Amino acid sequence: MNDNNNNNEFKPENLESLNNTEFHISIKDITGKEFNGPFELFYSLIKERKMDILNINLVEVIQLYVDYINNYLTKLKIDDLTEYLLMATYLLEQKSKRILPSMDTEEKISKDIERDKYIQRLLVYKQYQEIVPKLMEKLERRSRMFEKPTQSGEDKESLLKEFQDNSYVPAMDLDVILKAMQKVYLKLVTTKKTKSPKDNVKLIDVSEISIDDVEKEIREFLEPFPHLYKISFMDYFKNIPDEKFTKRYFVVAFVAILVLVRNGHIQLEQNSSDENIFIVKIDKEVESNEY
């Protein structure tokens, strides 16, 4: 019985899982706004009131969240409110703990740890929201330098919204990931050019390669391997066919990797001893059984 209860328990470290692409609840019809996960709603309530995240009053924000749920979400015809209500239940529990006086030093420390987890998560989310426009601007600038850009204006807006609607951000700086891919490209491009004369290569129109295509390629490559299998950027991309090997392909691959990280299909790791970045396969079924 205890094991089942533990599996259903909502924890701050699991917040990112509530904003994945498999769970989209739109409340735009009633409020004029749209939230695709409870943590995004939680963060928006803080941002709209211009609260200082480092000095946030969790009791106040929790009440705002619960009030919002009562005022709007219960009026909608939505089949699945589990994640929103689960978080509301957890937040109410945290609120009651903070309101009730505590004489136990250990309990007070536990409350502080919980609060620190929320603050850390909110700071990461805030940083991600601020860096997304810069990231997209950088990608557009690089695309203009490479082959003819494939993304229409609507596609770019859709991609931007897709990133903004999710709270997850890779543990390492996005510039670090991009620079690592650039180094891999520069190292491999010479080898591939000397190995196969261009005249003998049937070129693929990379303007037709989408982010979804590259996502699928990566997932199909990782499919036979077990949970937490890892492969370096270098080892993965050296298997890319010569006819696809272009700068434009790497730009698309960069975004595809971020999307896969965001959706929880892979993680990225970097060795402290060098600049190699590894793609780590995440098997969600195996991972869920570990909690």
UniProtKB/Swiss-Prot annotation:
Subcellular location: Cytoplasm
Entry keyword annotation includes Iron-sulfur: no
Recorded coiled-coil stretches: none
Presence of keyword Cell division: yes
Keywords: Cell cycle, Cell division, Chromosome partition, Cytoplasm
Subunit structure: Component of a cohesin-like complex composed of ScpA, ScpB and the Smc homodimer, in which ScpA and ScpB bind to the head domain of Smc. The presence of the three proteins is required for the association of the complex with DNA.
Described function: Participates in chromosomal partition during cell division. May act via the formation of a condensin-like complex containing Smc and ScpB that pull DNA away from mid-cell into both cell halves.
UniProt-recorded name of the protein: Segregation and condensation protein A
Organism from which the protein derives: Malacoplasma penetrans (strain HF-2)
